[in-house]
Amino acid sequence: MEMKKLIERINFLYKKSKEDGLTEEEKKEQDTLRREYIEIIKGNVKVQLSKVKKI
């Protein structure tokens, strides 16, 4: 999923959870999306760190 859409969906589910609550299916989706987001961020950090050179 594209990062922008991933973040939009995570934010939507968060707001909905505060206003109306989430169904079990939505809670599972929220957890899956958050895990996917974290994996993307971890991958980005690893790439950035691999480009760092010792001086």
Curated annotation (Swiss-Prot):
A Gene Ontology cellular component where this protein is annotated is:
cytoplasm
Q: What is its main location?
A: cytoplasm
Q: Give the similarity note.
A: Belongs to the UPF0291 family.
In terms of Gene3D superfamilies, this protein maps to: Helix hairpin bin (1.10.287.540)
HAMAP family in the cross-refs: UPF0291
* Key words of the record: Cytoplasm
- Where does it live in the cell? Cytoplasm
Asked if the record carries the keyword Cytoplasm, the reply is yes
Native species = Clostridium acetobutylicum (strain ATCC 824 / DSM 792 / JCM 1419 / IAM 19013 / LMG 5710 / NBRC 13948 / NRRL B-527 / VKM B-1787 / 2291 / W)
Protein's name in the database: UPF0291 protein CA_C2726
